[in-house]
Swiss-Prot record:
The gene is rpl23. GO terms for cellular component: chloroplast; ribonucleoprotein complex; ribosome. It comes from Anthoceros angustus. Gene3D superfamilies: 3.30.70.330. PANTHER family: 60S RIBOSOMAL PROTEIN L23A. GO terms for molecular function: rRNA binding; structural constituent of ribosome. This is Large ribosomal subunit protein uL23c. Keywords: Chloroplast, Plastid, Ribonucleoprotein, Ribosomal protein, RNA-binding, rRNA-binding.
Length: 91
């Protein structure tokens, strides 16, 4: 799916893994229901809750041109306790 860009792995999101929460960057136009349906179908998991936020806009300079990088929405997805996403498993 084009709307889910990639999983996010930072110090905070690694701490969220202990609470069975996973973080993804998604397209701004994607709705929670679309993302929830895609996550459940693709990973065969049960989603309990979803939280989303848009990180603040930041300026970026490339030579004399000042612009903004591509915007995205960050989704924090909580799964039922007996499910997990294999992308994030330690081996």
């Amino acid at each position: 799916m084009d709307k889910v860009k990639y999983p996010v792995l930072t110090e905070k999101t690694i701490r969220l893994l202990e609470r069975n929460q996973y973080c993804f960057d998604v397209d701004l136009k994607a709705s929670k229901t679309e993302i929830k349906q895609w996550i459940q179908d693709f990973f065969k998991v049960k989603v309990v809750a979803m939280n989303s936020h848009r990180p603040p806009k930041k300026k970026k300079r490339i030579g004399p041109v000042l612009g903004y990088p591509v915007r995205y929405k960050r989704m924090i997805i909580t799964l039922e306790s007996n499910y997990s996403i294999p992308l994030f498993l330690n081996k």
